[in-house]
Amino acid sequence: MKTALITGVNGQDGSYLAELLLSKGYNVWGTIRRNSSPEYNTTRVDHIFEKINLVYADLTDMSSLVSVLQKAKPDEIYNLAAQSHVRVSFDAPIYTAEATGLGTLNLLESIRLTCPKARIYQASSSEMFGNNIDKDGYQRETTQLSPVSPYGCAKVFSYNICNNYRNSYGMHISNGILFNHESPRRGMNFVTNKVVNGAVKIVRREAEDLVLGNLAASRDWGHARDYVQAMWLMLQQDEPDNYVCATGVSHTIQDLVDYTFKSLGLNPNTYIKTSQKFERPEELEHLKGDSTKLRTKLGWKTTYTFETMLDEMIFVASNKLNKDVDTKKF
């Protein structure tokens, strides 16, 4: 039986990855940070709570990482923990750099000292590209990195230090350059769930409008279930590498709004307002990824479209108060 350690197991990706690994017979360990609301902190993994080993650790505290690694003795390590909200990174740039950037270095050094043969997945991000885009309109593994946010800068450091440790110490480290991926488990401060839940509240007459930022920004949105499958595939390869994980299809936030509101029988023009308060100091305008390498080399494929992903999110948001619907399985 393989043992896997997931940092940030209580996040969107961590919870789906834990489910996937359990289905494959893994012994799963997951780290969470201590905070003032431990019950809320484990909401996404409550349904598998008894099947995984939950431990407290923090990427900014190397001693806690060493302790967990010595206990778990993992064969595979998935580093998903981070301060992952781009807009928040402008308000908390130093913490973002420490947790998302230096935190990765703390983990790599801890692994090098305790279990250097373990295979490591690093959650890299399309935010590293910034507004750089190839002539054909896509971003891929060879596209120049030029981040436009503190979060993107921290992810570039993590990406580069992973490459450095792989080359310097022969460690099996793969960077997954993931484009935006969503689900019903996405945090409410991210635009997809903000739009979906905002629309549902309007239907229920719990809100009169929804205020958003730049509606023209476009993103390549996929489903988190598909993307954790890619993470696992990367660590099953004999040789580590870097891979873009994306659908190859881009939609604007206006597209997101239109589909969601019309699905619920609402006219978006009636309810949507915009405010510069929700725009970034430097905006990332366009993301669309080319995952040819991942698809051809590892056989990865998507099972959700933009529309079916949103359909699922709308269904769950609309049925959260319905006791006859088990929304935790989504």
Q: Where does each model-flagged region fall?
A:
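N-terminal Rossmann-like NAD(P)+-binding domain of SDR-like oxidoreductases, especially those catalyzing
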Residues: 1-181, 225, 235, 304, ...
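Residue-level signal for the nucleotide or nucleotide-sugar donor/cofactor binding architecture
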Residues: 60, 91, 99-102, 142, ...
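Short secondary-structure junction motifs
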Residues: 117, 173, 207, 240-242, ...
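NAD(P)-dependent short-chain dehydrogenase/reductase
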Residues: 132-138, 156, 160-236, 248-253, ...
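C-terminal "lid/loop" region of Rossmann-like NAD(P)-dependent oxidoreductases
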Residues: 210, 214, 241-243, 251-258, ...
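Non-catalytic, hydrophobic alpha-helical segments
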Residues: 227, 231, 245, 256, ...
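C-terminal amphipathic/interface module of NAD(P)-dependent oxidoreductases
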Residues: 288-330
